[in-house]
Amino acid sequence: MLGTINTTGMQGFNKSERCPRDTRMTQLLFPVLYTVVFLAGILLNTVALWVFVHIPSNSTFIVYLKNTLVADLIMALMLPFKILSDSHLAPWQLRGFVCTLSSVVFYETMYVGIMMLGLIAFDRFLKIIMPFRKTFVKKTAFAKTVSISVWSLMFFISLPNMILNKEATPSSVKKCASLKSPLGLWWHQVVSHTCQFIFWAVFILMLLFYAVITKKVYNSYRKFRSKDSRHKRLEVKVFIVMAVFFVCFAPLHFVRIPYTYSQTTNKTDCRLENQLFIAKEATLFLATTNICMDPLIYIILCKKFTQKVPCVRWGKARTAGSSEDHHSSQTDNITLA
């Protein structure tokens, strides 16, 4: 096995020497786009942090939202390193730091965020299907334990990617795969497949949860009022969460398997490898925009959050109207808040 790993590692290194990467787009366009996302993400998540500091963690829902916020903030803080590295505005040593540490932390927190969104969907599912049944999964102690487990899992599977690396040189930092030891390349493949499994498992479960939630809400509205604009808006809210999750994360996971394969074998031609690299960078940027989308989810789903944000609270107060609207608004809070 060690012989196979060593051969794979040498292939990855030799390939980086004979297959130079086309970085014109990643050096010019993506750093600008990432800068916009970084500034917007820091602003939105700083406001969200201020709000959540004033909200006690007295429900599983709030616990999951707070963990999502922490993951998003850490992701955002990793972006300046990528921006400086990709734009070649920093010394080559920073590129080595990005490959061995900051990008690893970035991916780690991305998958923490993915699992937290899955737990949020599960929490909504339980509150809609079993609103009055008391069970241990509805206790904050359970939510905190699961959250710690998620962070611990991602930390321990990410740690070898920070350790199993060779000494950085000006030539080896051009491709992160060239920095990895033979065992590090093998572990990178293991982690990549593990993360693929995490994403698709969460996505399928979210799809099932929200399908059941939508059916439950639809049947409830049919029973009491057959045609209601509030009902349609509520359906849109439910599917917006699924849409954001799919649009942000699915493209990256379609691309990541062939990209990782191209990085760890010697069977991909240079043109295809460069195309996969651009596709990976484009879909990674799309996934990064999730740090700006999650604060919108807080506003849509969390009543306590909107009560703490003055501009949102003022806007809702202006739109508050008849008693029928008030009743519908409360129904929305029961189903989504």
From Swiss-Prot:
Function: Receptor for ADP. Coupled to G(i)-proteins. May play a role in hematopoiesis and the immune system.
Membrane protein topology class: Multi-pass membrane protein
Membrane side Cytoplasmic: residue ranges: 53-60, 123-144, 215-237, 303-337
List of glycosylated residues: N6, N14, N266
SUPFAM superfamilies recorded: Family A G protein-coupled receptor-like
PANTHER family: P2Y PURINOCEPTOR 13 (PTHR24233:SF10), P2Y PURINOCEPTOR-RELATED G-PROTEIN COUPLED RECEPTOR (PTHR24233)
Location(s) in or outside the cell: Cell membrane
Predominant subcellular localization, coarse grouping: membrane
UniProt cross-references to PROSITE patterns, sorted A to Z: G_PROTEIN_RECEP_F1_1, G_PROTEIN_RECEP_F1_2
Cystine connections: C99-C176
Name recorded for this polypeptide: P2Y purinoceptor 13
Transmembrane segments: 32-52, 61-81, 102-122, 145-165, 194-214, 238-258, 282-302
UniProt keyword list: Cell membrane, Disulfide bond, G-protein coupled receptor, Glycoprotein, Membrane, Receptor, Transducer, Transmembrane, Transmembrane helix
Organism of this sequence: Mus musculus
Extracellular side: 1-31, 82-101, 166-193, 259-281
Family per record: Belongs to the G-protein coupled receptor 1 family.
Superkingdom as given in the UniProt entry: Eukaryota
